[in-house]
Every structure is written in C-alpha cells, then in structure tokens.
Amino acid sequence: MATNSDNFEDSIKSRSEEFVADFDHHEKGVVGFIHETLHKYPFFVPLIVMIVAIIVFGLINPNFYRVNTLSVILQQVGIVGILGTAQAIVILTAGIDLSVGAIMVFTTVIMGQFSFRYGIPAEITIIIGIAAAGFMGFCNGWLVARLRLPPFIVTLGTWQIILAANFIYSRNETIRSQDIAAEASALQFWGTIFKIGDARVTYGVIAFLVLVAIMAYVLSSTAWGRHVYAVGDDPEAAELAGVNKERVLIQVYTLAGILCGIAGWVAIGRFGAISPGASTGVQGNIQSITAVVIGGISLFGGRGSIIGMFLGALIVGVFEMGLRMAGADAQWTFLLIGVLIIAAVTIDQWIRKVAA
C-alpha cells in the first residue's frame, strides 16, 4: 500500500510540475514579456503616453510642435519637477511627504523676510532659506526614522505647522516683484531668460534639468542610491545587509527638504513676487505626487526612477498645454490626469502581483 501511495503522490507531483511548467511557458509569452519589461523599465509607460499625447496634440494643432511650445511646457513644469524629485526619493523609501509645497513656500518667505526685514544680503538669505528647508526635512526624517511614526501622519502634521508658521512669521505680507528686482535681484536669478534659437528658456529650466540628471545618476550609480531602493523594497533585508535604515531615511527627508528650498528659490524667479498665500503650498503636494505616480514610481517603494518622474511631470505639462491650444475646457486636464493616475496605480499593482 505504501508503494502504491508513493507512486500516486509521485504521479500527482509530476503532473503538477508539468502544469506549472506549461503555465510559466504561457506566462512568458507576450503578457509575460510586457510584465518583465515594465518591471525592469517602469518609465516605459509614461514615455509611451507622452509620445502618443505629443502626436495627438500635434495633429490637432500643428503649432504644438513649435520649439517655443516645448520651452513654455518646461517652464511650467520646472517647479513641479523639482518638487517631484524631492517627492520621488521619499516615495522610493515607501514613504510620502505631504509638506513639500509648504516647505517650498516657507523658504521663499524666509528668503524675502531676511532680505527686506533684516537687511541681510540676498546671497546669504538664499543659503539661510535652503538650510532652513533642509532642517524642516530633517525634522520629518527624524520623526519617521527615530520615532517610527507613519510618514503620512508626520508630514500631514508638519504641512499644517509649516503653513501656519509661514503666515504668522510673514504677517501675511506679500513682497512685490519690483521691490525684489530693485533690492534683492539675486532672489530672481532663476527667472532670467535667454534664447536658444526661437525658444525662450529660463535659468530655472536649466536648474530643473540639471537636478534631475544629478539625482538620476545618484540613485542609479551610487551605493547611497542602492541603499534608498533597498530600504523601500525590503527594510528588514536592507538592515540585515548592513544598511543603516534610520540614517538613510533621515538623509532622504533632509535632501528632500533641500530640494524644496531650491524649488522655492526657482519659484521666486518664475513668479517674481513672494507671497505666503501662494497656491503651491497646497497644490505642490498634489502635483508632485501626480508626477511621481504617473512616472511609474511605486507608492509601495523600491521601484521606479527619477527619469520616470521627469516624464510624469512633462505629461502633465503636455496635457495642460495641448488641451489649452485645442480650446478645451481646463477641467478636461484634471479628468485625464485623474484617469492616468488610476491607470498608473493599476499597472503598478499588476506588476507587483505578477512579480509576487
């Protein structure tokens, strides 16, 4: 009986292995190839979406292909892109930062108030502002890493605290563009325009592109970048491999704060004036998360790239500009972006499910 039972179990096991082999072979067809490609290169989806959008909007309005149109899109998404870079490195660690917009606006207020209220040279107030932004990011990181509080709750709280401090400290006063140009022109440096052929480009666009290139290199080609991915993918395994998770998290949130400070400096150049009530304090959070999600970075951490975020930010700019040139209602932009967000998260879930 034991022999017959063993033969029966061996037969079932053999058939199961054949079935699994057939199933795996089937999965490695077209669907399997798509899954493997997207898992390895998550920015492919936003790249395809952007190319299709450019083709469609170009067919609707040939002026969309003008070089000047691209330069305008880059100027529009520059600030969001820098905030998106800050958001991306946090989300790669399986966190989220809801305070990026508030830190950016408060940085502009600090630079403005130190220049006009205390009479400190603009070059020094810029350093003070970015350092303050880094400190705000450090506080987020310390609360998340050392006290092990949920990133969502921590940054939701600091978002409110920073926004309130922003209005209290500034007394809700706006510093006019002409006053900044006359007395603290260095604050508007990134708004300087130069021409490349027919395109009008600001230094702020260059700052955005350089920061994206630097962070893309750091995350893909340095040990620190690999540690960021490791902490987001599997923090326990990362610690077993010798990665100091707490230190990496604090560094990530601090760097995110510094990037928000740089975004604040660029924003002064883009808009000219300094206003504590700037809408970016609220919208910056949503826009940065949108660029990250559409760009293929997983909200669960450990997967994605800065290049994907860059493409996600461009997609938002392309849709806004394309629909505006087509004469469509602005609400269509929000509708289509919402669809893209849901589609991006759905694709991410599919990739994670199949990979599991």
Residue ranges of predicted features:
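Cytosolic-side transmembrane-helix boundaries in multi-pass membrane proteins
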Residues: A2-A53, L240-R247, R270, F319-A356
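Transmembrane alpha-helical segments in multi-pass inner-membrane proteins
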Residues: S14, T254, C260, F271-G338
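Short loop segments and helix-boundary regions at transmembrane helix junctions
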Residues: F33-L38, I91-I96, R117, F135-D179, ...
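Single transmembrane alpha-helix segments in multi-pass membrane proteins
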Residues: I55-Y118, A122, W142-R148, I289-I307, ...
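Inter-helical junctions in multi-pass inner-membrane proteins, predominant
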Residues: I60-V72, F167-E173, V218-G225, L249, ...
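Hydrophobic alpha-helical segments embedded in the membrane of multi-pass proteins
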Residues: Q76-Q87, A102-F106, Q160, L209-A213, ...
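Helix-loop-helix "hairpin" substructures at the membrane interface of multi-pass membrane proteins
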Residues: I120-G129, F135-N140, V144, G197-S275
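Transmembrane helix-bundle core of multi-pass membrane transporters
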Residues: F152-T155, W159-S221, V248-Q251, F271-G281
